[in-house]
């Protein structure tokens, strides 16, 4: 395959975080594992948080995370940047600063030229440079499909770790990127997306969550997570269950990327979206909401935005300052005392 003809999304079965194992399969796989017994482990796997946090000293803790994805975009350099932005996001979501990273590349050497991998790695380096994160090495595996990601280590003060399990009743919920990257990536793969839709999806997926995270830290958030493979509904369920609360989402307020509604109507919905819906639908109260309108809320996001829980006064100030600094931010819900189900959509 020559480099000029490459459309990376067509070389893989599923694009971006839509290729992740579904929540039901993952839950089954993890069911027999025990929590690591180490008093210095601040955050482990039990709350499905964005990363693990390990205390080194009274003032320094490490945030550890790893993300690997298939291409959600056709251009190799764009794919590399998106994959790195996706991996860095977990550190930002937990209130940390990315420190070091290692490349993880799975490459079909029989079907793609080495220059393609070079472009992918260059795109990843672009994002790391912007984040001020030092690349220290990596690992490659020859594989049937192209996959790329990074393991990232960040630092945070042990008493300032942000979790997905500490939302409080009365909090407002803010989202810092629109939804739809999984749907639009599927449309790109199926050659159904317009040039404008593809460009918008790539731009949002390429955007680091750094600016939103740095602003967030000024307003003492109750909780935070990033929206990735399990969609807005899935990650809201994780936050609600971990926090012992119910999250209410305002369907009309949830922002979507350009063309998402049309692509859903045309059937450009990734299998991962349906897996998420199958697993989480019984865990939410969606009332009489139109099922088709709900689909983007289950859409697996690649390098999605932050879901931030802030007290109302802080949320208003955050929104105002975000607008002044051209940081995307939309109020999409609030946090209620625990009801029968973890998530309500109205």
From Swiss-Prot:
A GO CC term assigned to this protein in UniProt: cytoplasm
Co-factor remark: Binds 1 Mg(2+) ion per monomer.
One Pfam entry name: AIRS
Binding site for ATP: 20, 47-49, 67, 90, 138-140
Coiled coil segments of this chain: none
Active-site residue numbers: 17
InterPro entries for this protein: PurM-like_C_dom, PurM-like_C_sf, PurM-like_N, PurM-like_N_sf, SelD_I, SPS/SelD
Enzyme class: transferase
Iron-sulfur is among the record's keywords: no
Reactions catalysed: hydrogenselenide + ATP + H2O = selenophosphate + AMP + phosphate + 2 H(+)
Keyword Kinase annotated: yes
One Gene Ontology term from the biological process aspect of the record: selenocysteine biosynthetic process
UniProt site (Important for catalytic activity): 20
Function recorded in the entry: Synthesizes selenophosphate from selenide and ATP.
Subunit annotation: Homodimer.
Entry protein name: Selenide, water dikinase
Organism: Trichlorobacter lovleyi (strain ATCC BAA-1151 / DSM 17278 / SZ)
Gene of this entry: selD
């Amino acid at each position: 395959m020559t480099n000029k003809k490459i459309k990376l999304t067509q070389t893989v079965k599923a694009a971006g975080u839509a290729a992740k194992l579904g929540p039901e399969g993952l839950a089954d796989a993890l069911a027999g594992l025990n929590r690591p017994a180490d008093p210095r482990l601040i955050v482990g796997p039990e709350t499905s948080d964005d990363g693990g946090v390990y205390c080194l000293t009274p003032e320094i803790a490490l945030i550890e995370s790893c993300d690997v994805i298939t291409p959600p975009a056709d251009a190799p350099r764009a794919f590399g940047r998106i994959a790195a932005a996706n991996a860095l996001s977990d550190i930002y979501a937990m209130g940390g600063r990315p420190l070091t990273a290692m490349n993880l590349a799975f490459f079909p050497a029989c079907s793609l030229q080495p220059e393609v991998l070079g472009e992918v790695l260059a795109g990843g380096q672009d994002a790391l440079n912007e984040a001020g994160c030092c690349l220290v090495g990596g690992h490659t595996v020859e594989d049937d499909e192209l996959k790329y990601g990074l393991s990232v280590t960040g630092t945070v003060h042990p008493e300032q770790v942000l979790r997905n399990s500490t939302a409080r009743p009365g909090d407002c919920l803010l989202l810092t990127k629109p939804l739809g990257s999984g749907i639009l990536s599927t449309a790109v793969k199926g050659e159904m997306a317009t040039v404008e839709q593809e460009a918008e999806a790539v731009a949002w997926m390429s955007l680091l969550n750094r600016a939103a995270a740095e602003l967030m830290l000024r307003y003492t958030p109750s909780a935070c997570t990033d929206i990735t493979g399990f969609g807005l509904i899935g990650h809201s369920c994780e936050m609600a269950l971990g926090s012992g609360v119910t999250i209410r989402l305002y369907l009309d307020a949830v922002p979507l990327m350009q063309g998402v509604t049309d692509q859903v109507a045309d059937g450009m919905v990734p299998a991962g979206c349906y897996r998420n819906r199958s697993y989480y639908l019984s865990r939410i109260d969606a009332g009489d909401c139109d099922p088709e309108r709900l689909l983007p809320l289950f859409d697996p996001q690649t390098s999605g935005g932050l879901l931030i829980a802030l007290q109302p006064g802080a949320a208003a100030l955050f929104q105002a300052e975000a607008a002044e600094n051209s940081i995307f931010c939309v109020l999409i819900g609030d946090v209620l005392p625990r009801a029968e189900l973890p998530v309500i959509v109205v």
